[in-house]
């Protein structure tokens, strides 16, 4: 019985910590092929400047696809081949914010975009 109570207590602690981290995306919309959009992600509940950050996406009926990541100091970025040369990831550590500038958009870029720590 003691083990069961300890397990429930541990789960509650872990869930409580996870719930403090918040990432809120904005900036999506409808755009014609060839157009541009800028996504933003407002982070809270952790020291944003300590973490690499990523953008991932999920196209309708498909799995998650990694798009890009950026180092904590912005000194290093990397992109999926499918978006290289068209998308630019950036961040503002003073504002706890992550961005994704998307240019030359294509039909295949249609997806739900998420920022991730």
From Swiss-Prot:
Pyrrolidone carboxylic acid PTM sites in chain numbering: 20
Key words, A-Z: Adaptive immunity, Cell membrane, Disulfide bond, Immunity, Immunoglobulin, Immunoglobulin domain, Membrane, Pyrrolidone carboxylic acid, Secreted, Signal
Region (Complementarity-determining-1): 45-52
Subcellular location: Secreted; Cell membrane
GO cellular component: extracellular region; immunoglobulin complex; plasma membrane
Record bears the keyword Cell inner membrane: no
Pfam families in alphabetical order: V-set
Signal found in the keyword field: yes
Location of region: Framework-3: 78-115
Region feature Complementarity-determining-3, mapped onto this chain: 116-117
Domain Ig-like: 20-117
Disulfide pattern: 41-115
Signal peptide: 1-19
SUPFAM superfamilies: Immunoglobulin (SSF48726)
Chain intervals for the UniProt region annotation (Complementarity-determining-2): 70-77
GO molecular function: antigen binding
Region (Framework-2) location: 53-69
Location of the region described as Framework-1 in the Swiss-Prot/TrEMBL record: 20-44
A biological process from GO: immune response
Free-text function comment from the UniProt entry: V region of the variable domain of immunoglobulin heavy chains that participates in the antigen recognition. Immunoglobulins, also known as antibodies, are membrane-bound or secreted glycoproteins produced by B lymphocytes. In the recognition phase of humoral immunity, the membrane-bound immunoglobulins serve as receptors which, upon binding of a specific antigen, trigger the clonal expansion and differentiation of B lymphocytes into immunoglobulins-secreting plasma cells.
Assembly and oligomerization: Immunoglobulins are composed of two identical heavy chains and two identical light chains; disulfide-linked.
Name recorded for this polypeptide: Immunoglobulin heavy variable 3-11
Name of the gene this protein is made from: IGHV3-11
